[in-house]
Amino acid sequence: MSLDRNIRMVTICDTDGKIMYSDHRPGVTNLLTSDESRKSLEMAVNAWKSRSQLASKIGKGKYVLADYEKIKRITMPFGDTHLVYVTTEPQANHAYIISEITSLASSLDNA
């Protein structure tokens, strides 16, 4: 959360969608209900799995950015067995956030 003030929410889950960590920025109003949030995460995990089936031909996915009117959603690998799911304000610098998450994941892999 301290990475960028435009981050609304961060969730880390395994590749089956089991939530390992989740937090919202203080003062952020949820746009989705709890059930809708779980469904959105489930859809993102399933979409990531589908894309991963092509990795042997096109390479491993680095990230997916969904740009909506009210938020941006970033889904990307966090190590070999987890995904990070981040929502931001629309004006967020997603390239910076993606770069920082990639660096953090790499430092954890090398620890």
Language-model regions, residue ranges each:
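Non-catalytic interaction/Regulatory regions outside core domains
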Residues: 1-111
